């Protein structure tokens, strides 16, 4: 990875702290040639637009196999690729691999059928002078998929399809808004708040 990324030269051999994993939700492509393979719902491929520190996710597509993978690239994008051109917009979406139109009715139907999943786009680590963006890591993704939260909110979301859109996509409870790994992290943070409170009370005695 570092060979193609001059910005990583100073980090070779170091262990960096992960501060975030970036994911995209996915649904089966509506294109028959994709045979139900999942494609991402992405508003933008940008990771950072800061001048001199531009970074974005570049999709490497193999149309013959109906597959894709994500690479993190830095600097200004090459002509022909616009990171602002995601796969989902107000008017609908498109299949990342084939370009086939993917309307919201299709996305909603897949969500309601429990077919909405996630795919890792990038890993964010703490660098010497700010954030550093790395390619997706299969081992990290595998660990995230094994997460089992000790608790999750079972309360139902408001049923108001006009103003509250998430139930339209199969997300009916507050727990549905988060992935298992996110719920695990939130429960951990909540537990730590309780421990901190107990520590403060103990120190006040």
Identify what each model region corresponds to:
Residues 1-205:
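Charged, often flexible domain-edge or linker segments that flank or initiate folded functional domains
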């Amino acid at each position: 990875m570092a060979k193609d990324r001059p910005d990583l030269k100073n980090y070779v051999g170091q262990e960096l702290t992960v501060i975030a994993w970036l994911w995209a939700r996915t649904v089966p492509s509506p294109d028959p040639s994709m045979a139900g393979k999942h494609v991402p719902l992405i508003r933008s491929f940008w990771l950072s637009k800061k001048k001199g520190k531009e970074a974005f996710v570049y999709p490497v597509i193999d149309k013959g196999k109906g597959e894709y993978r994500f690479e993190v690239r830095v600097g200004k994008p090459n002509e022909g690729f616009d990171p602002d051109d995601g796969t989902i917009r107000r008017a609908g979406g498109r299949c990342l691999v084939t370009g086939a139109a993917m309307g919201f009715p299709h996305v909603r139907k897949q969500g309601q059928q429990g077919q909405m999943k996630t795919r890792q786009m990038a890993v964010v680590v703490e660098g010497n002078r700010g954030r550093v963006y790395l390619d997706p890591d299969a081992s990290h993704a595998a660990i995230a998929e094994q997460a089992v939260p000790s608790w999750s909110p079972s309360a139902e979301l408001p049923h108001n399809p006009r103003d509250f859109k998430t139930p339209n996509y199969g997300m009916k409870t507050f727990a549905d808004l988060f992935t298992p790994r996110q719920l695990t992290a939130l429960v951990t943070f909540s537990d730590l708040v309780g421990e901190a409170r107990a520590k403060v009370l103990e120190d006040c005695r």
